């Protein structure tokens, strides 16, 4: 595994003003698609690719005008026209795709990293975590804040009620679905560790994701 071009934290933040065009490698995942929409809203040119495109995320991505390609069209020369590659956690550590990303010479990171560095800075971030109910509870919290007159930012891991899955918002509040699963093959820890949460709502806690956790106590840690 060659992580010479992997960026996160302060190193990623330093690149922010130099990033004009971003590529999402496996864009059709719910988190990846929602992240792509946030960066597009922030004024960054966004494109992506995946092996297959399934609704509802594929339908929503199509409506945004974000160019999406088949992964079989993606090679080193293709990737080198981008300033940053966002890698989905469906990319295995030992794979041709991982090697392609590592060897193309372009900085790469995960979507939780880019959200933490590019979107959530200076926001009052409320994380919604738990084994069950994260998406629904994030949606409810967003509606509650809106009913109080706020225009919050939000990040929901799904398409609900014909609203975008994510929005930067105008108020200081940002509600974000905070998944305990790993961020990427090069960041084998929970996504919410990269969000710098101000507060967290924990909906439930059960043993899950046996591929990265040994027990419910391991998840608690």
Predicted regions and their residues:
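N-terminal leader/targeting and accessory segments in enzymes
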Residues: 1-110, 114, 216
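Phosphate-binding loop of NTP-binding sites
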Residues: 38-41, 76-77, 89, 93-221
């Amino acid at each position: 595994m060659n992580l010479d071009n992997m960026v996160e934290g302060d190193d990623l933040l330093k690149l922010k003003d130099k990033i004009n065009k971003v590529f999402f490698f496996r864009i059709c995942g719910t988190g990846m698609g929602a992240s792509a929409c946030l960066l597009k809203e922030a004024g960054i040119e966004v494109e992506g690719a995946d092996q297959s495109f399934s609704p509802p995320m594929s339908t929503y991505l199509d409506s945004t005008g974000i160019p999406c390609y088949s992964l079989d069209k993606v090679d080193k020369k293709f990737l080198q026209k981008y300033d940053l590659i966002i890698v989905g956690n469906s990319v295995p550590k030992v794979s041709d795709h991982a090697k392609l990303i590592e060897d193309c010479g372009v900085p790469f990171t995960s979507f939780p990293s880019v959200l933490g560095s590019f979107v959530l800075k200076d926001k009052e971030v409320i994380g919604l975590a738990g084994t069950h109910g994260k998406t629904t509870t994030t949606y409810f919290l967003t509606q509650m804040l809106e009913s109080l007159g706020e225009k919050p930012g939000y990040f929901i891991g799904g398409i609900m009620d014909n609203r975008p899955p994510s929005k930067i918002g105008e108020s200081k509040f940002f509600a974000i679905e905070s998944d305990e699963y790993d961020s990427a093959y090069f960041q084998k820890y929970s996504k919410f560790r990269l969000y710098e949460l101000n507060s967290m709502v924990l909906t439930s806690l059960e043993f899950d994701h046996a591929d990265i956790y040994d027990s419910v106590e391991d998840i608690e840690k």
